[in-house]
Amino acid sequence: MAPKKQNGFMMFVNEWRNRNAEGRRMTLAEAVYHCGTIWEKMDTQQRGPYNSDAKDANAARRDKRGSLNGHGQVDKAQREAAESLMDKAQREAAESLMDMKRTTERLVLNAKMSHDLENAKFVFVAFNYFTKALTTDVYVPAEFAACEYSLKEGIRSIYSTMIDPGQIIFGQGSDALHNSSTTHDLPLPPNALGEKNMVKLYRNILDYLTKCQGEGKTPIVFTPAENIGMVKSCFRYLECEDDSRDGGGKIEVFDIQYLLFILKKEVMSVAGLNDEKINKFATDAFFKNDFFEFTAGIACQISSINTRDYHVATLIGLLPAQTINVYLGSTLRSMHEVLSDNDTKLTGYISFLFEVICGVALMFWVLQKARKELSETLLSADYNNEGKHPDVQV
């Protein structure tokens, strides 16, 4: 079936949705209904630019189709143009990957050169979502969690919140119900729990990241490689509601598995150990082994009641921190011995093993206490009311 031609009215609808936060919250059908009354009141002069844009779009689409030669093949020039676009996309992806690696390496190396690697702070994040659009990478977020981590202290602070987007993507109620029932088991909109104001929520997240990383810095967070696309999409979902932002200061999402690889190499370097056998394939394999899957008492009360411990966003955000502790434990102890012998500034490890055990125990206690307080508040409330759920910050 040939694609439908553009018309001036739909050009107006699309522009109105892009420019208004109210429009971005509407489905296409709702936006068409709303804009219909506005379009009827517009005169020919006001409609002119939109009708002209529609004609230009139709003409551009006809030109893009191009023509076939006598053998039914695409013209050589068109094929080369398409290949050029593919090459450009591949180059941009490669450049983005290299930029991520360079930035991660710079963060770790700067801390190492300033003799403060053990106190360097990193933020790990995780999202749960209700559903994903069928043809685009748009995710509707359901829950967010972040934790601040350092080699010396382990988990330093936790931020978590449930999210009520108000509605899910039109026609995907069944998909959202299936995803929820098989993962986080959170109630769907319009009965969802948590923060309803996306602008407030996004600014609260930025405030937490600024508190962790300092003023005037681009916020950088880490998440497992397979979740990077989903996490970026959820941040865009929250950010697009904020009309006051000019697009600056976006949150950068990096690969936590590459961070683990660089940390392992640099810690071994400080400890004077041979790191020639360390490679990313080995660290990735270790990271994907879940050593805490059957650990009891580390999820919130609601998740425990619903037998959904493994999918709660807070737990997803905390597991990488514990994995790094396990993987780097012996190497960090060796680094401490070398630094103690050389009388350097890194003298914080009196007994690293004891600190790790105490840190993990303290983390479990703090997490359980915070989530228990949250669950008691939620369980005492009626799930059919507005479900206002305050952010939780530990």
UniProtKB/Swiss-Prot annotation:
One of its GO terms (cellular component) is cytoplasm. InterPro entries: HMG_box_dom_sf, Maelstrom, Protein_maelstrom. Residues 44-93 are annotated as: Disordered. Keywords: Cytoplasm, Developmental protein, Differentiation, DNA-binding, Meiosis, Nucleus, Oogenesis, Repressor, RNA-mediated gene silencing, Transcription, Transcription regulation. GO terms for biological process: germ-line stem cell population maintenance; male meiotic nuclear division; negative regulation of DNA-templated transcription; oogenesis; piRNA processing; regulation of miRNA-mediated gene silencing; regulatory ncRNA-mediated gene silencing; spermatogenesis. Residues 2-69 bind DNA. SUPFAM superfamilies: HMG-box. It is found in: Cytoplasm; Nucleus. The keyword Amino-acid biosynthesis does not apply. Residues 73-93 have a biased composition (Basic and acidic residues). GO terms for molecular function: transcription cis-regulatory region binding. This is Protein maelstrom. Involved both in the piRNA and miRNA metabolic processes. As a component of the meiotic nuage, plays a central role during oogenesis by repressing transposable elements and preventing their mobilization, which is essential for the germline integrity. Repression of transposable elements is mediated via the piRNA metabolic process, which mediates the repression of transposable elements during meiosis by forming complexes composed of piRNAs and Piwi proteins and governs the repression of transposons. Its main location: cytoplasm. Belongs to the maelstrom family. Pfam families: Maelstrom.
